[in-house]
Amino acid sequence: MNTHGKLSKRIKQKFIKQLVAPGAQAAIDQMKFEIASEFGVNLGPDTTACANGFFGAEITKCLVQLREKLGSRY
């Protein structure tokens, strides 16, 4: 791995899963479980990679729709 790859990996590890709003983790987790249940996905270690990928895409769509709905208020 080149130096750029190592730096990129360190940056990702440092910043991954840091929420912008402190205390938002509970709300994010609740949203994940609600969206998963809407699609019949049981979150857990036995969930397939395919189901996780589909689920991740749906979360992204929901977040984009929420941001569009809220507009520039935040």
Curated annotation (Swiss-Prot):
It holds the Pfam family SASP. InterPro entries: SASP_alpha/beta-type, SASP_alpha/beta-type_CS, SASP_DNA-binding, SASP_sf_alpha/beta. GO terms for biological process: DNA topological change. Keywords: DNA-binding. GO terms for molecular function: double-stranded DNA binding. It comes from the Bacteria. Belongs to the alpha/beta-type SASP family. PANTHER family: SMALL, ACID-SOLUBLE SPORE PROTEIN A. This is Protein SspS. It comes from Streptococcus pyogenes. The lineage of its organism: Bacteria, Bacillati, Bacillota, Bacilli, Lactobacillales.
